[in-house]
């Protein structure tokens, strides 16, 4: 069996245990002292209510905490008694200024530098003087001046912007007024972008029932020819339809292949307002569909039928409309039609109702 040894000490506890409490008490006293002087929690206190320093300054070796920074306040050895006398006199006089903050002269430069730092920190806790107020007033006056300058600039800009549209809305000259009366309300961009097209077809496929492109003509707004070519269909031609199309076998000798002609035609039509009579047949032969908003079909414009004294719901031929409205004969004889002549007649017919029809389309745009 092992024996158990107990070492017990029944003497009085050592004085070291109370050392920590004494330090803490000194720390609390110093903290209260600094709080009374207003050096702690400086941000929470108003600047005009700084507590007066009534107690003695810190002695040699003591520490003070200013703004959370622990600093040692060195004091000269020779003049401790004189400093204590001065402190007692200042405590009696409540209205005495904080003159003890000015450090006594010493030979060591390090102590002088530390005291100057403390003076700067202590003076920051004092209430603000009139000089700071003057600076603030100067800043306010500058802000007011800047605001007034900005307001005047904004007003001048507004006046300039108001003056400009007056020049645009000025009364036009007599020549301008006459030109506006003569010109219709149609957009001026349309005539340059308007073309009329007409195609002639031949019969391909079983018994020549399939209509294939054999000639295409395109004219501009003034009737000038932009494109007129014979086109060789990709399929064998069964029926030339010479009586209506005017196409003969000799025309196909040097004809342009369909793919090449189609690409050339579509380049001209892209972005243009295309006018035609029963134009859906021409698009079908080209294997192409143009946007409805850029298509004008003279066979489906009721205004032309009304001017020709015909019912609006009846589809009239190009030959009949040209005879009635333009007093001209087209598609005459056994030689067949001319696609150039038909395209020019289509453009002239559309010009008769251009203003009214474009206004109608502007109010009722077609859906693509």
Swiss-Prot record:
Indicate where this protein resides in the cell.
Answer: Nucleus, Nucleolus
Q: Where is the composition biased (Basic and acidic residues)?
A: 77-96
Any idea what job this protein has? 3'-> 5'-exoribonuclease involved in ribosome biogenesis in the processing of the 12S pre-rRNA. Displays a strong specificity for a 3'-end containing a free hydroxyl group.
The processes (GO biological process) annotated in the record are: ribosome biogenesis
- Matches recorded under Gene3D superfamilies: Ribonuclease H-like superfamily/Ribonuclease H
Composition bias type Polar residues, residue spans: 42-54
Q: Which residues form the Exonuclease domain?
A: 194-368
Q: Where is the composition biased (Basic residues)?
A: 131-145
GO cellular component term of the entry, any: nucleolus
| Region Disordered, residue ranges | 33-107, 127-187
PANTHER family referenced in this protein's UniProt entry, alphabetically: INTERFERON-STIMULATED 20 KDA EXONUCLEASE-LIKE 2, RNA EXONUCLEASE REXO1 / RECO3 FAMILY MEMBER-RELATED
Keyword flag Hydrolase: yes
Entry EC number(s): 3.1.-.-
**SUPFAM superfamilies on file:** Ribonuclease H-like (SSF53098)
The name under which this protein is listed is Interferon-stimulated 20 kDa exonuclease-like 2
The keyword Transport belongs to this UniProt entry's keyword annotation: no
Q: Name one GO molecular function term.
A: nucleic acid binding
Q: What class of enzyme is it?
A: hydrolase
Its keywords, alphabetically, are:
Exonuclease, Hydrolase, Nuclease, Nucleus, Ribosome biogenesis
- Please classify the protein's predominant subcellular localization into one broad category: nucleus
Matching InterPro entries: Exonuclease_RNaseT/DNA_pol3, ISG20_DEDDh, REXO1/3/4-like, RNaseH-like_sf, RNaseH_sf
């Amino acid at each position: 069996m092992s024996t158990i040894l107990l070492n017990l000490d029944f003497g009085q506890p050592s004085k070291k245990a109370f050392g920590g409490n004494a330090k803490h008490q000194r720390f609390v006293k110093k903290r209260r002292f600094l709080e009374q002087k207003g050096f702690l929690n400086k941000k929470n206190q108003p600047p005009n209510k700084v507590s007066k320093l009534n107690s003695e300054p810190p002695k040699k070796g003591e520490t003070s905490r200013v703004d959370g920074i622990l600093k040692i306040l060195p004091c000269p050895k020779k003049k401790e008694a004189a400093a204590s006398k001065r402190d007692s006199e200042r405590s009696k006089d409540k209205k005495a200024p904080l003159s003890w903050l000015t450090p006594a002269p010493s030979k060591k430069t390090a102590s002088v530098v530390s005291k100057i730092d403390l003076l700067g920190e202590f003076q920051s806790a004092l209430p603000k003087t009139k000089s700071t107020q003057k600076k603030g007033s100067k800043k306010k006056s500058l802000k007011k001046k800047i605001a007034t300058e900005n307001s005047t600039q904004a007003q001048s800009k507004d006046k300039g912007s108001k003056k400009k549209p007056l020049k645009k809305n000025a009364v036009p000259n007599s020549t301008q007024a006459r030109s506006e009366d003569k010109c219709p309300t149609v957009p001026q961009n349309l005539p340059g972008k308007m073309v009329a097209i007409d195609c002639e077809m031949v019969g391909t496929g079983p018994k020549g029932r399939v209509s294939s492109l054999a000639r295409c003509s395109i004219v501009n707004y003034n009737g000038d020819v932009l494109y007129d070519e014979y086109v060789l269909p990709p399929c064998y031609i069964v029926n030339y339809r010479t009586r209506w199309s005017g196409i003969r076998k000799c025309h196909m000798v040097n004809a342009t292949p369909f793919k090449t002609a189609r690409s050339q035609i579509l380049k001209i039509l892209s972005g243009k307002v295309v006018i035609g009579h029963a134009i859906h047949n021409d698009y079908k032969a080209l294997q192409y569909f143009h946007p409805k908003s850029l298509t004008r079909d003279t066979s489906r414009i009721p205004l032309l039928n009304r001017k020709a004294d015909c019912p609006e719901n009846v589809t009239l031929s190009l030959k009949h409309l040209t005879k009635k409205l333009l007093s001209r004969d087209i598609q005459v004889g056994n030689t067949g039609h001319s696609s150039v002549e038909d395209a020019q007649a289509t453009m002239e017919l559309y010009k008769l109702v251009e203003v009214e029809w474009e206004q109608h389309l502007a109010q009722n745009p077609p859906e693509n």
